């Protein structure tokens, strides 16, 4: 097994051990809490682990630039701590997914029911009183909040092995900034879904870009890179270089996601075809589409986008409209340009070749993914 594969296995073991310990705590309180830990552990069992891998290889790269090399014992201790740091990022991401699916009213995640739907099904199957839907909402809010708290706990425990207090403080600052930025991005995303129809078409592109920057680019790629480098005591110049690599890559990552959200294969993505259209997502792809339509067609497209109840033929019409407007081709070009910008920035980083090669391989996976 290669180094990345070993890391992913160790992260899964870390998360499983953490959840098993919490299962004991919950069981001692009440057996009614078992579904909470079941749904949490199920969600943590899958995913691409991009954030963890970007964090780890950034740490490896930053270590190679350190003026004083670590001893083998110090490196092993730091590597063990990095597993915890990476696991915390994955716990945080899973929490964000729980809340994101609820906000988007998305019924599925990775081909299985979303957490709020699992709680809803539990309510219905148990024959309980009240609204199953409201129970699902309440359960998923609480599970997401719980996982956010657990991510901070795992992160804090990992930082106990930080080489010094300066590094510990830098890591905490980066983690805190990530939390603020992704929550801000989530709010702006919800805001756009509800307010975009009251704004001009000309405003849509800039506002969609802003959501993309904070909800995805900084959170998914830049923050893990900066946390990993900070844990290695990376210098400010290196962190700036990693941002120059991570932000355009994160933007390209989201543009790929936007395309998959409209044109992706459900068998691969685990979500229904055109799911972003049903959810009324105000993506860059949608903004470019509206810019390229006549007022009459634009009005029809806008009405469909805000309806939330779309038939398959309406999805097909919107997909065709997006393609014929030129928005799909423009989005793909943007993605390619951002990817080139990112890879050029990576090439200029003064880190060792092993870290650079692994970061490049990760970047290419992000850009070319099909799910």
What are the functions of these language-model segments?
Residues 109-144, 196-217, 240-244, 266-292, ...:
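Divalent-cation-assisted or electrostatically stabilized phosphate/pyrophosphate-binding catalytic cores
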Residues 30-31, 256-269, 297-305, 314-316, ...:
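A glycine-biased, small/acidic residue-tolerant capping/turn segment at secondary-structure junctions
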Residues 80-113, 173-184, 218, 222-229, ...:
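Active-site alpha-helical segments that house and flank conserved acidic catalytic motifs
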Residues 61-64, 73, 228-237, 260-268, ...:
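C-terminal helix-coil-helix/basic helical segment that borders enzyme active sites and/or dimer interfaces
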Residues 316-371:
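C-terminal charged capping/lid subdomain of soluble metabolic enzymes
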Residues 54, 151, 185, 286, ...:
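Residue-level signal for inorganic ion chemistry
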Residues 25-30, 42-52, 141-150, 154-263:
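All-alpha helical catalytic cores of prenyl diphosphate-utilizing isoprenoid enzymes
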Residues 1-89, 94, 98-133, 186-206, ...:
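Conserved N-terminal diphosphate/IPP-binding helix and adjacent helical/loop segment
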């Amino acid at each position: 097994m290669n180094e990345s594969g070993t890391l992913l296995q160790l992260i899964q073991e870390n998360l499983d051990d953490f959840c098993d310990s919490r299962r004991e705590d919950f069981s001692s309180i009440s057996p009614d809490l078992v579904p909470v830990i079941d749904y949490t552990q199920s969600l943590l069992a899958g995913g691409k682990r991009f954030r963890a891998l970007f964090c780890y290889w950034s740490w490896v790269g930053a270590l190679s630039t350190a003026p004083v090399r670590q001893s083998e014992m110090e490196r092993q201790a730091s590597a063990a701590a990095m597993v915890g740091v990476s696991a915390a990022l994955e716990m945080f991401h899973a929490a964000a997914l729980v809340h994101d699916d609820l906000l988007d009213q998305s019924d599925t995640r990775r081909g299985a029911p979303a957490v709020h739907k699992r709680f809803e099904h539990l309510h219905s199957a148990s024959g309980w009183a009240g609204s199953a839907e409201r129970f699902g909402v309440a359960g998923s809010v609480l599970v997401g909040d719980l996982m956010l708290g657990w991510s901070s706990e795992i992160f804090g425990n990992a930082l106990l092995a930080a080489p010094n207090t300066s590094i510990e403080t830098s890591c905490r600052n980066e983690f805190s900034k990530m939390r603020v930025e992704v929550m801000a991005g989530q709010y702006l995303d919800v805001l756009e879904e509800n307010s975009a129809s009251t704004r001009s078409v000309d405003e849509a592109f800039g506002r969609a870009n802003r959501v993309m920057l904070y909800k995805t680019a900084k959170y998914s790629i830049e923050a893990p890179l900066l946390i990993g480098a900070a844990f290695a005591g990376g210098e400010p110049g290196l962190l700036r270089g990693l941002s120059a690599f991570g932000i355009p890559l994160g933007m390209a990552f989201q543009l790929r996601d936007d395309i998959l959200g409209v044109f992706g294969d459900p068998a691969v993505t685990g979500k229904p075809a055109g799911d972003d259209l049903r959810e009324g997502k105000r993506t860059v792809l949608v903004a470019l589409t509206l810019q390229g339509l006549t007022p009459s067609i634009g009005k029809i497209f806008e009405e469909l986008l805000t309806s939330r109840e779309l038939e398959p033929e309406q999805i097909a019409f919107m997909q065709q409209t997006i393609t014929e407007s030129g928005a799909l081709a423009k989005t793909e070009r943007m993605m390619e340009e951002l990817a080139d910008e990112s890879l050029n920035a990576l090439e200029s980083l003064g880190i060792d070749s092993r870290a650079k090669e692994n970061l490049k391989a990760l970047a290419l996976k992000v850009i070319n993914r099909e799910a």
